[in-house]
Amino acid sequence: AADLLVVCDYGQILSNEALATTPLGGINLHGSLLPKYRGAAPVHWAIYNGDLETGVTVIHMTPRLDGGPILERVTVTIESTETMPQLEARLSNLGRSCVLSAMLQLEDWDGTSLIGELQDASQVSKAPRLTKEQGQIQWEQSAEQIKNQVRAFQPWPGSYTWLLQEAQEPLRLVLGDTRVG
């Protein structure tokens, strides 16, 4: 039988019963500096919001969404032209060593004492799932915000606008790259 559940990019909350099936419970690799950006799309929202840094966090799992004690955390700078897939790949590479380090912390754990660092509830922010509608560019936003949206919403939902032409159906235009300046 397994001693530990390891979860990465899993869109569900595991119950206490599921976590109790292994002596050490479970750990979760999350693509943000928890407690910031709890939820399904942390990398997208970090770029969209113009954050200068993000990272990965490994938590000991509890039934609260991304709310368990922090075992490992690594911070990285978000490059100004980096897209979501590029940043996600970098974070994924960092995550491997963080998961291994967290597993070593649990190796001698007694299963009852608190392990890790409790998250600061006053610092919690959400990273909800994206919707297709969020990809529509709002032209009243700044050029920098539109650039961040295009970078953040790749590959889905993408960033798009509508071209209205006289006596024709509206044409949906998808933006794939932007440069401010």
Model-based region annotation:
Residues 121-181:
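Internal anion-binding site segments
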Residues 4-126:
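Donor/substrate-binding cores of folate-linked one-carbon enzymes
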